[in-house]
């Protein structure tokens, strides 16, 4: 995994943290022939990491700052098998052929999941911070008859202080994995 500090960052544009990227990549179970859709690409951390492990990535975000930040990071890491799009994912999904999806954040999640089901997408991994969004996504996947697995990941970083070391926690992330039955 690329360290977070190596990515170009823009204020207000989120990035999936290194340890969360590692677990999410593992849950996607990528292979070199996969074509992946990254919805809510943010700073492009997942787009970069997925591109290194798959055939091609389509990245979408509705923020121009996020799109530009992702493009900058793709160039920085010399990634050529990823194309970035600005817009609403629910309006763009039908334009692409892909077999796996990573969702880092989006609006209209229930509509998007319905479209993914219609396209018979075999694996979707969605990361959430907000509990209500986790419940909404899990419930919708179950309604759509996906096999659903989820894990809540908490990461703490060590910091040296005068009297020793302490662990500083980051926000826990729920990683939801849905597999087509």
Swiss-Prot record:
GO terms for biological process: anaerobic cobalamin biosynthetic process; methylation. It is an enzyme of class 2 (transferase). It catalyses: Co-precorrin-6B + S-adenosyl-L-methionine = Co-precorrin-7 + S-adenosyl-L-homocysteine + CO2. S-adenosyl-L-methionine binds at residues 16, 40-44, 61, 89. Keywords: Cobalamin biosynthesis, Methyltransferase, S-adenosyl-L-methionine, Transferase. InterPro entries: CbiT, Cbl_synth_MTase_CbiT, Cobalamin_biosynth_MTase, Methyltransf_25, SAM-dependent_MTases_sf. It comes from the Archaea. The keyword Transferase applies. Its EC number is 2.1.1.196. The keyword Transmembrane does not apply. CDD domains: AdoMet_MTases (cd02440). Belongs to the methyltransferase superfamily. Archaeal-type CbiT family. This is Probable cobalt-precorrin-6B C(15)-methyltransferase (decarboxylating).
